[in-house]
Amino acid sequence: MTIKNHNYHMTRFITSAPDIRHLPQDMGIEVAFAGRSNAGKSSALNALTKQKSLARTSKTPGRTQLINLFEVEEGIRLVDLPGYGYAEVPEEMKRKWQKALGEYLQKRECLIGLVVLMDIRHPLKDLDQQMIQWAVAMQVPVMVLLTKADKLASGARKSQLNKVRDALLALNGDIQVEYFSVPKKIGIDKLHQKLDIWFSQKAVQVENHR
């Protein structure tokens, strides 16, 4: 299989939607980014695409209340899902977001991969595990990025990485776990490579079904 090197810096914003009913037609291929409200999803998307404000970052966790879609090239999209688990968001809104997340993961046919971002200091909270379990149940491959890796010394960082990898082994899913830090540019290349592999694999599958 030939791995195509996609130009993520050409990525552009398409639309926002409150739930899957308001998303564009379920065609093409999508990789979704999920994580707690302070995990650094928007910063990761901006670092991947080398665009400072493609995904809106905020000092106030929980500002990503919509499903935000970005087009890498025709038919290939990145999806920024609503951040979850932020305490100051009203319960009704939390339930609404979680319903939107669940529906997207379980019903969106063009979803081919899920990137789950977790603060390396506080990984595998209940909702993180639920997202990964949903993906494994739907046979969607997962890349876990342990963000803010620069906040820990190398020994503690390695220990956290091993703990998370060991904890996820029991799920028997297609799960890769890596460090990630935007300021230190750790893990950005691995994310780029993983997305290229996912998009290329799907392109081959589509070609073989023609």
Curated annotation (Swiss-Prot):
Function of the protein: Necessary for normal cell division and for the maintenance of normal septation.
Organism of derivation: Photorhabdus laumondii subsp. laumondii (strain DSM 15139 / CIP 105565 / TT01)
Protein's GO biological process: division septum assembly
Residue positions binding Mg(2+): 42, 64
UniProt family annotation: Belongs to the TRAFAC class TrmE-Era-EngA-EngB-Septin-like GTPase superfamily. EngB GTPase family.
InterPro entries: G_ENGB_dom, GTP-bd, GTP-bd_ribosome_bio_YsxC, P-loop_NTPase
Keywords on record: Cell cycle, Cell division, GTP-binding, Magnesium, Metal-binding, Nucleotide-binding, Septation
Lineage, highest ranks first: Bacteria, Pseudomonadati, Pseudomonadota, Gammaproteobacteria, Enterobacterales
Protein name (record): Probable GTP-binding protein EngB
Cofactor: Mg(2+)
Pfam families reported in the protein's UniProt record: MMR_HSR1
NCBIfam families hit by this protein: GTPase_YsxC
Residues in EngB-type G domain copies: 27-201
Key word GTP-binding present: yes
Ligand binding (GTP): 35-42, 62-66, 80-83, 147-150, 180-182
CDD domains per UniProt: YihA_EngB
GO cellular component: cytosol
Protein encoded by which gene: engB
GO molecular function: GTP binding; metal ion binding
